A protein has these predicted regions:
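Short hydrophobic/aromatic beta-strand or adjacent loop that forms the aromatic wall/cage
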Residues: 1, 73, 146-150
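N-terminal leader/capping segments at the start of a protein or of a new domain
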Residues: 1-42
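Conserved Nudix-box catalytic region and its N-terminal flanking loop in Nudix hydrolases
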Residues: 18-28, 79-116, 121
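Acidic, metal-coordinating catalytic segment for phosphate/diphosphate chemistry
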Residues: 31-75
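Conserved beta-strand and immediately adjacent loop positions that scaffold enzyme active sites
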Residues: 75, 84, 171
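Conserved hydrophobic "DFG−1" position in protein kinase catalytic cores
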Residues: 78-79, 152
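Unchanged
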Residues: 101-190
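Charged phosphate-binding loop/patch that engages nucleotide di/tri-phosphates or the phosphate backbone
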Residues: 190-201
Length: 201
């Protein structure tokens, strides 16, 4: 399955209709369905969730995103010795540390750098790739697709995280997954995908 977010809306491409409600299910017919969904999501005050069903999801996905410029990014879900995970609060939503890859960086290098910059935690050790997420946003005069490589990282020190305020990060807090599930403030859909990926392991 392939999934892309635009604000709180998402479009997914898969081989069978989902069991969840509140999703509009359509057959994949044309690459322009990506733009149609974006326009619907922009004009609606509520999240718009589309599922495009096809026997060939990889081919359909490549056609849907072919016209979009892609920016590569990387980030991390950090786990401490107590089994808690580090989340940051930025722009009125809970998020995870991440950022664009610099030229010449590998995704792993970028993920470590971004987490260290945004939380001041070091040393960090990558224990594995969790997932990739996609989201679309308006950049200057066009829509852009950001692909983020997410890694599970371990931190065994006792230093408290320090939020990078220049990046609008207000808080950085350790939580177990039960505490995370009880959060009252909004959480980015991509972050929920990352958390689901670690609970599925």
């Amino acid at each position: 399955m392939y999934k892309v977010f635009f604000n709180d809306s998402f479009l997914q491409v898969c081989t069978a209709p989902p069991t969840e409600k509140n999703r509009e299910v359509k057959p994949f017919t044309t690459p322009t369905q990506m733009d149609e969904w974006i326009n619907c999501a922009r004009e609606s005050s509520n999240p718009i969730h589309w599922t495009l069903v096809t026997e060939h999801p990889q081919q359909a996905w490549q056609q849907l995103i072919a016209h979009l410029p892609i920016i590569e990014a990387a980030g991390g879900l950090v786990r401490n010795a107590d089994g808690k995970y580090l989340f940051i609060y930025r722009r009125k939503r809970w998020d995870l540390p991440k950022g664009k890859m610099d030229e010449g960086e590998t995704p792993e290098q970028a993920a470590l750098r971004e987490v260290e910059e945004e939380t001041s935690l070091t040393p960090l050790k990558i224990s594995g790739l969790l997932t990739h997420t996609f989201h679309i946003y308006w950049l200057r005069d066009h829509f852009t697709l950001k692909r983020t490589h997410w890694y599970l990282m371990d931190y065994n020190g006792n230093k408290a995280p320090v939020p990078q305020t220049i990046e609008d990060i207000e808080r950085a807090e350790w939580m177990n997954l039960e505490e995370f599930s009880r959060l009252q403030e909004p959480v980015f859909g991509t972050v929920l995908e990352v958390v689901r990926s670690v609970t599925a392991k």
